[in-house]
Amino acid sequence: MTHRTLTRRALLGSAALAPLLVACATHDAMPQVDPSAPTYGTLRIGYGALREMHAVAHVYAQALRRVGYTVELVETGHSRSLALRALLAPSGRQESTGTESTTPEVSEAEATAAYEALPVDRGAASVEAQDVDPLDIVIDYSGDLLLYLTDDGKLSPAAVQNERVAASVTASAAAAGVTLPPAPTQSPTPSDTASGSGETGEASGTASPSADSSANPTASASATRSADPINLRAMTTTDMTNAISRILPEGLNLLNGASATNKDVLVTTRAVSARYKLTSLVGLRDVRSTLGFSIPDSYSVGTYGIESLRSLYRFTARAVTQQNDPAERVRALTDDSVQVTLLHSVNPAIDDNRLVVLEDPSSAMLQQQLVPIIRRTLPDSARNAVNRVSSTLDTGNLSFLLQLTSGSNPIADDDAAQFILDHPRK
């Protein structure tokens, strides 16, 4: 047992945590062990490079072990496409493992179509399904995931659905040795041109049907490519998860997300805020000095990235450093190498360093929610265990979990996970 673990365990028992422990006096009944869980084999949970994903993955793992599963944790880094493809990769398990699941296995054709339909991360090479180690659960952020699935918000859920249907039909036909006719070229009609961007994605997909579209689904998929983009800034976390559930590839399901309130925020130090009277993103354009920004790669491109500051606040960031590690971004901010950085609102570094969250009246920053995506054949007892954890991960619990597992003297992730499961806030 390490010295840091002992130190933080002593802290857990101190008077500083007395209010929390009192609030947690009432415990949920321990979940029942699933006697068939061991027959599933090793259940593998993938998590990204962010600290909160790592911490939550350990809580899910502890909960799954308590109901009888053997669990392995796998860091997937910053590659969303690789993580989701791992959920679709062949697991090597027998179709019937003895564990109860109400959802049937997808066909090989469906799995292939879903695998190939997923976008590839920028700069990443395409990976064959047999070259990916399979995963059973992946943790992601809802806003970022929806941007990924809709091509940075350019496609409506209706458009994505039609493309997935077309890909699945084409793959099934190819597996059966049938070649479908090519999709006819869609010429804009006067009504299409007149409607412009005023129609919904669903409406534009049916506004000008062709006689061939029912026979060849790729025609309707091609037509809905022109569907209106979605406005993620106007979406609640519930809207986002509903949209994600609708457009996830065949073979994947979305479980309940953590109930914590969380979003992307741009922050600065109190010194910079005072120096430039900067408390809101509106005030960025009034700062006459060049402000340095530290942002992750994912925020560097697209209409929902740093470009949104120009479109919504008439401010262009000219000195931008890309750093994917939030801890590195905080260090750059506090040593004044940069003056503004992007964090998640639950990041304990905001309070620890007394950082100023810049107000965002035009909603440039997206709502975010930690969500588990699963292989469709995940047994019901595993689904229930994950959903129970998500229901307890409100803002207070998630923030407290991150406080325990980060900073200069963090405790072990497994110890923090065990504490959160044994003492959830009520």
Regions found by a protein language model. Give the residues of each.
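Short helices/loops that flank or line small-molecule/ion binding pockets
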Residues: H58-R66, R80-P134, E307-L312, A319, ...
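An extracytoplasmic/periplasmic, membrane-proximal ligand-sensing/linker region
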Residues: G41, R51-E52, S187, A211, ...
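Periplasmic-binding protein-like
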Residues: L135-D140
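N-terminal secretory signal peptides and thylakoid transit peptides that target proteins
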Residues: T2-P19
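Bacterial signal peptide processing site
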Residues: A25-D28
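Bilobed "Venus flytrap"/periplasmic-binding protein-like clamshell domains
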Residues: Y40-G77, L82-A83, G257-R329, D380, ...
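Ligand-binding "clamshell"
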Residues: A124, A129-V132, Y148-Q186, A211, ...
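Ser/Thr-rich, Proline-interspersed low-complexity disordered segments
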Residues: Q32-S36, T103, T112-E116, V120, ...
